[in-house]
């Protein structure tokens, strides 16, 4: 995985002024999942569509904005 993944989720979240805890509470995605995506332990490109939808809705971005390789 590349650093791009971290940039997408973490940077978008930080630019919105939302903490990981807040994002978890607002989106319904587990805090540990968010942490693992941002730390590149889990590949966000392999996340369930529902998870990506929840994150994108709260962050006000497209699902593609969160993906490392949106063209795949």
Describe each model-derived feature in a short phrase.
Residues 19, 30-33, 48, 62:
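Short coil turns linking two alpha-helices in DNA-binding domains
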Residues 9, 23-24, 34-37, 66:
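Conserved hydrophobic/aromatic packing and binding residues within compact polymer-binding modules
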Residues 29-45:
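Recognition helix of helix-turn-helix/homeodomain-like DNA-binding domains
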Residues 49-65:
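DNA major-groove recognition helix of helix-turn-helix/homeodomain DNA-binding modules
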């Amino acid at each position: 995985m590349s650093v791009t993944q971290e940039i997408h989720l973490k940077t978008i979240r930080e630019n919105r002024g939302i903490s990981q805890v807040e994002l978890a509470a607002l989106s319904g995605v587990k805090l540990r999942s968010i942490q693992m995506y941002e730390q590149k332990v889990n590949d966000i490109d392999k996340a369930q569509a529902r998870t990506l939808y929840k994150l994108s809705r709260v962050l006000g971005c497209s699902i593609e904005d969160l993906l490392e390789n949106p063209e795949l």
